[in-house]
From Swiss-Prot:
Substrate binds at residues 57, 73-75. Its cofactor is pyruvate. It is found in: Cytoplasm. GO terms for cellular component: cytosol. It catalyses: L-aspartate + H(+) = beta-alanine + CO2. GO terms for biological process: alanine biosynthetic process; pantothenate biosynthetic process. It comes from Corynebacterium urealyticum (strain ATCC 43042 / DSM 7109). This is Aspartate 1-decarboxylase. Binds 1 pyruvoyl group covalently per subunit. Keywords: Autocatalytic cleavage, Cytoplasm, Decarboxylase, Lyase, Pantothenate biosynthesis, Pyruvate, Schiff base, Zymogen. The active site is at residues 25, 58. Belongs to the PanD family. The keyword Lyase applies.
Length: 139
């Protein structure tokens, strides 16, 4: 049996640009792509935290160290500069591969610089104001 699993997650990145007239895709700083194990041309989902829009597109490598998160083409009607987004990549694994399976979960700061790398998709970094869905308030 094959299962589609979370492979890569860039959490709470800030959109730096959006342009209807670019070829459709999402431009991502090469440092973040490397950290999250996302390849150019790889299918990704983008979830806009500010407005709830969710879309599927593909990754384009942006300038290394620039912090760029660019929404290109028609998606620029759904996601705007300044919006916080989650960028998600998935992998298809057979059951034998799942024993060594570990997603790459990247947290970034307001300039889209990596501040934390983990493997737990539900982890909420201390002091982030985020909640871990596995741990109710007060535990």
């Amino acid at each position: 049996m094959f299962r589609t699993m979370l492979k890569s997650k860039i959490h709470r990145a800030t959109v730096t640009q959006a342009d209807l007239h670019y070829v459709g895709s999402c431009t991502i700083d090469a440092d973040l792509m490397d950290a999250a194990d996302i390849l150019e041309g790889e299918q990704i989902d983008i979830v806009d935290i500010d407005n709830g829009n969710r879309l599927t597109t593909y990754a384009i490598t942006g300038e290394r160290g620039s912090g760029v998160i660019g929404i290109n083409g028609a998606a620029a009607r759904l996601i705007s500069p300044g919006d916080l987004v989650i960028i998600i990549g998935y992998g298809i694994f057979d059951n034998a591969e799942l024993g060594d399976y570990h997603p790459r979960v990247i947290f970034v700061d307001e300039n889209n610089k990596q501040v934390e790398l983990g493997e737990d998709p539900a982890h909420a970094p201390a002091g982030s104001g985020l909640k871990d869905p596995r741990h109710p308030e007060g535990e």
